[in-house]
Regions:
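Flexible, glycine/charged-enriched surface loops at secondary-structure junctions
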Residues: 44-49, 151-158, 252-259
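Metabolite-binding pocket within alpha/beta catalytic cores that recognizes anionic/polar moieties
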Residues: 1-142
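Generic non-transmembrane alpha-helical segments
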Residues: 142-150, 205, 244-255
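Generic structural signal for well-ordered, non-membrane alpha-helical segments
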Residues: 27, 31-34, 70-77, 132, ...
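Zn-dependent metallopeptidase/amidohydrolase metal-coordination segment
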Residues: 200-234
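Active-site rim beta-loop-alpha module in soluble metabolic enzymes
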Residues: 133-191
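Short acidic/polar active-site loop segments enriched in Thr and Asp
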Residues: 90-91, 193, 212
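His/Asp/Glu-rich mid-to-C-terminal helical/loop segments that flank catalytic regions of hydrolases
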Residues: 223-259
C-alpha cells in the first residue's frame, strides 16, 4: 500500500499519530461537538483538524482519552475508526443523534444500540451481509449503567442504519420508493428502535479490527409518532447523550485499570 503519510507518522485523513490520541475515543459525527465533549476531559487540547475529522485529547480518570469527529455516514466513520485503531485506540463510543421509530421512543430519550440493520453500503466492503453488526457487550453494558445512574430515559435495542437521510424522510419521492417503504415497515415490525447512519459500519469495522465499539444517541424526534398525530416533541440538546457516553467511558477505564 502507498504510504500517503509520506513518512510523517500521521494518518492521512485524520491527521493523528500514536502519540496524539488515547486508547479510549468518543466519536461524534459533527466536528463542532468535539470541543463540547472535550470540556468533560481534564486538560483537553486540540491535536488535529483535517477535513471532517477534528480531534481533541485530554484525560479521564487519569487515562489519556480522545474525541474525534467522523462526519456523516459510514464511509467517513469507517476511515476514522480504522486510522484511530492503527494509532493504538481500542475502545470507541459513538455518540450522536437519531430519529425514533417505535411509539415509546420519545424526543429527549437516549437509544443505546445493541445491533444495527446493515442497510448502508460501507459494512458490505468489510463482511458479507449475513454477518451481524453488533455492539461490544462491555461497552453497551457501561452505556446502560451510565444512563441508569444519570436517571436518563433510555432504550436498548437494534437501530436501522441507512445511507440516505431523505430516503428515510421522503421515501415516496425516490425511484425505489417501493423498496424503501416496504423495508421501513419491516424494520418497524421487527422492533427497530431508531434510525441513524453510522453504527452498522462502526460495529462491523470494529469487529474486523478487534476493537470495542458501542453507540448511544439522543432521540431528536419520532416521525412515526408524527404520522399518527401523536405528541412529537423535538429535542436537540446533545449534552444528554454526551453525558452518558462520558460516564460510560469512565466506567470502562476504571474496569480496565482494575483488571
Amino acid at each position: 500500500m502507498v504510504d500517503y503519510t509520506e513518512g510523517s507518522g500521521k494518518q492521512y485523513h485524520t491527521g493523528v499519530g500514536p502519540s496524539d490520541i488515547g486508547k479510549y475515543v468518543i466519536l461524534p459525527g459533527d466536528p463542532k461537538r468535539c470541543a463540547k465533549i472535550a470540556e468533560h476531559f481534564e486538560n483537553p487540547r486540540l491535536v488535529a483538524d483535517v477535513r471532517e475529522y477534528v480531534t481533541y485529547t485530554g484525560t479521564l480518570c487519569g487515562q489519556k482519552v480522545s474525541v474525534t469527529s467522523t462526519g456523516i455516514g459510514g464511509p467517513s466513520a469507517s476511515i476514522a475508526i480504522d486510522e484511530l485503531a492503527k494509532c493504538g485506540a481500542h475502545t470507541f463510543i459513538r455518540v450522536g443523534t437519531c430519529g425514533g421509530m417505535q411509539e415509546n421512543v420519545l424526543g429527549g430519550d437516549v437509544v443505546i444500540a445493541t445491533g444495527a440493520v446493515r442497510m448502508e453500503g460501507t459494512s458490505r466492503e468489510f463482511a458479507p451481509i449475513e454477518y451481524p453488526a453488533v455492539s461490544d457487550f462491555g461497552v453497551t453494558a457501561a452505556l446502560k449503567n451510565a444512563a441508569e445512574s444519570l436517571g436518563i430515559s433510555h432504550h436498548l435495542g437494534v437501530v436501522q442504519c441507512k445511507d440516505s437521510f431523505f430516503g428515510q424522510h421522503e421515501p415516496e419521492i425516490m425511484p425505489v420508493s417501493y423498496e424503501l417503504e416496504n423495508k421501513w415497515q419491516a424494520w418497524l415490525r421487527m422492533g427497530c428502535l431508531a434510525s441513524e447512519m453510522e453504527s452498522a459500519a462502526l460495529f462491523i469495522a470494529g469487529q474486523f479490527l478487534r476493537v470495542r465499539v458501542g453507540s448511544c444517541f439522543l432521540v431528536v424526534a419520532n416521525q412515526e409518532r408524527a404520522k399518527k398525530g401523536l405528541e412529537n416533541k423535538q429535542v436537540h440538546d446533545t449534552e444528554i447523550a454526551i453525558k452518558v457516553a462520558v460516564e460510560a467511558m469512565k466506567e470502562l477505564i476504571k474496569k480496565d485499570c482494575n483488571s
